[in-house]
């Protein structure tokens, strides 16, 4: 991937970049069977805003971006509808998204009374703790954890994925992507461990929640959830760091860094050691897309 002087960089120099880069979680991408139904559900039940929508007839798909704030500052959900496909397999590996709210009971009642989503876990304290949570399921089967919290600039607060080796995954996200381990919690009574990773405090930004279930090393991925996009100041340097870490911990570069045809947005993509896809997007190019 690198050439000339770049090829001579020591691993230490390459791995310094993720520590000083200004990365940000941009959006999660997944597929839905009825785009208008999902937009209606998320806006009416969860209180999200439809941020933008684009139809690409030559490639037979439509995208919609939803969230609680503008994409230049907030995380978004990118929904993809592929013409004629009304059902997907979510698989066992994807866990949930999470929404922070000041009143879980009130939000759950709103969902019950006027929504195509359904409450699958009634509001109440989390097992073994005091945080009030509930779970809702959207029409495609995606789960949303509702978490009671004070006011936050980012209500869309988690993407939860299951992994087969938590320590390996933590090391990968720290070294390759410069994330911070914000919290780690073992729950032996229920045989799982979680780790929260991100670029700022949990109550201020979106984080990746990685879950390890005791003894489970592999999960089915299905074809519904696609990827998370992360903004970076330099796609080339970021991809170089990722490629180096994949040699140590596993994973795979899928797309070498470079501009997308037509858009000219510079991206790179890769799989983490568990096969979860991540796309790196140039921060400046992403902001141009939003104009």
From Swiss-Prot:
<keyword id="KW-0597">Phosphoprotein</keyword>
<dbReference type="GO" id="GO:0004462">
    <property type="term" value="F:lactoylglutathione lyase activity"/>
</dbReference>
<feature type="domain" description="VOC 1">
    <location>
        <begin position="24"/>
        <end position="149"/>
    </location>
</feature>
<feature type="domain" description="VOC 2">
    <location>
        <begin position="155"/>
        <end position="283"/>
    </location>
</feature>
<comment type="subunit">
    <text>Monomer.</text>
</comment>
<keyword id="KW-0677">Repeat</keyword>
<keyword id="KW-0479">Metal-binding</keyword>
<dbReference type="InterPro" id="IPR004360">
    <property type="entry name" value="Glyas_Fos-R_dOase_dom"/>
</dbReference>
<feature type="binding site">
    <location>
        <position position="82"/>
    </location>
    <ligand>
        <name>substrate</name>
    </ligand>
</feature>
<dbReference type="InterPro" id="IPR029068">
    <property type="entry name" value="Glyas_Bleomycin-R_OHBP_Dase"/>
</dbReference>
<feature type="active site">
    <location>
        <position position="158"/>
    </location>
</feature>
<dbReference type="GO" id="GO:0019243">
    <property type="term" value="P:methylglyoxal catabolic process to D-lactate via S-lactoyl-glutathione"/>
</dbReference>
<dbReference type="GO" id="GO:0009651">
    <property type="term" value="P:response to salt stress"/>
</dbReference>
<feature type="binding site">
    <location>
        <position position="209"/>
    </location>
    <ligand>
        <name>Ni(2+)</name>
    </ligand>
</feature>
<dbReference type="GO" id="GO:0016151">
    <property type="term" value="F:nickel cation binding"/>
</dbReference>
<dbReference type="GO" id="GO:0005737">
    <property type="term" value="C:cytoplasm"/>
</dbReference>
<feature type="binding site">
    <location>
        <position position="145"/>
    </location>
    <ligand>
        <name>Ni(2+)</name>
    </ligand>
</feature>
<dbReference type="Pfam" id="PF00903">
    <property type="entry name" value="Glyoxalase"/>
</dbReference>
<dbReference type="InterPro" id="IPR037523">
    <property type="entry name" value="VOC"/>
</dbReference>
<comment type="pathway">
    <text>Secondary metabolite metabolism; methylglyoxal degradation; (R)-lactate from methylglyoxal: step 1/2.</text>
</comment>
<keyword id="KW-0456">Lyase</keyword>
<feature type="active site">
    <location>
        <position position="96"/>
    </location>
</feature>
<dbReference type="GO" id="GO:0006970">
    <property type="term" value="P:response to osmotic stress"/>
</dbReference>
<feature type="active site" description="Proton donor/acceptor">
    <location>
        <position position="145"/>
    </location>
</feature>
<dbReference type="GO" id="GO:0019863">
    <property type="term" value="F:IgE binding"/>
</dbReference>
<comment type="similarity">
    <text>Belongs to the glyoxalase I family.</text>
</comment>
<comment type="function">
    <text>Catalyzes the conversion of hemimercaptal, formed from methylglyoxal and glutathione, to S-lactoylglutathione. Involved in the detoxifiation of methylglyoxal. Can functionally complement growth defect of a yeast mutant lacking GLY I. Involved in abiotic stress response. Over-expression of GLYI-11 in tobacco increases tolerance to osmotic, oxidative and salt stresses.</text>
</comment>
<dbReference type="GO" id="GO:0006979">
    <property type="term" value="P:response to oxidative stress"/>
</dbReference>
<feature type="active site">
    <location>
        <position position="209"/>
    </location>
</feature>
<feature type="binding site">
    <location>
        <position position="96"/>
    </location>
    <ligand>
        <name>substrate</name>
    </ligand>
</feature>
<protein>
    <recommendedName>
        <fullName>Lactoylglutathione lyase</fullName>
        <ecNumber>4.4.1.5</ecNumber>
    </recommendedName>
</protein>
<feature type="binding site">
    <location>
        <position position="31"/>
    </location>
    <ligand>
        <name>substrate</name>
    </ligand>
</feature>
<dbReference type="InterPro" id="IPR004361">
    <property type="entry name" value="Glyoxalase_1"/>
</dbReference>
<dbReference type="InterPro" id="IPR018146">
    <property type="entry name" value="Glyoxalase_1_CS"/>
</dbReference>
<keyword id="KW-0020">Allergen</keyword>
<keyword id="KW-0533">Nickel</keyword>
């Amino acid at each position: 991937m690198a050439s000339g002087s770049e090829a001579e960089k020591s691993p230490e120099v390459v791995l310094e970049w993720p520590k000083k880069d200004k990365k940000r979680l941009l959006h999660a991408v997944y597929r839905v069977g009825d785009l208008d139904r999902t937009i209606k559900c998320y806006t009416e039940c969860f209180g999200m805003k439809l941020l933008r929508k684009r139809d690409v007839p030559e490639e037979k798909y439509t995208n919609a971006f939803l969230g609680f704030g503008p994409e230049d500052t907030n995380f978004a959900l990118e929904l993809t509808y592929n013409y004629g496909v009304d059902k997907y397999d979510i698989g066992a590996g994807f866990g949930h998204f999470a929404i922070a709210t000041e009143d879980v009971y009130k939000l759950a009642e709103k969902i019950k009374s006027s929504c195509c989503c359904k409450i699958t876990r009634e509001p109440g304290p989390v097992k073994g703790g005091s945080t009030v949570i509930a779970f809702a399921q959207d029409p495609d089967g995606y789960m949303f954890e509702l978490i009671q919290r004070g006011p936050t600039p980012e209500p869309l607060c988690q993407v939860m994925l299951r992994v087969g080796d938590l320590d390996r995954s933590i090391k990968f996200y720290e070294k390759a992507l410069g994330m911070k381990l914000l919290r780690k919690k073992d729950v032996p009574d229920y045989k799982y461990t979680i780790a929260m990773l991100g670029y700022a405090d949990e109550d201020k930004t979106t984080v990746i929640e990685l879950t390890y279930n005791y003894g489970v090393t592999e999960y089915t991925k299905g074809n519904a959830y696609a990827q998370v996009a992360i903004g970076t100041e330099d796609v080339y340097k970021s991809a170089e760091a990722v490629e180096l870490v994949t040699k140590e911990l596993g994973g795979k570069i899928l797309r070498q860094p470079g501009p997308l045809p037509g858009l000219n947005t510079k991206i790179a993509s890769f799989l983490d050691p568990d096969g979860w896809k991540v796309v790196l997007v140039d921060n400046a190019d992403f902001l141009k897309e939003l104009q």
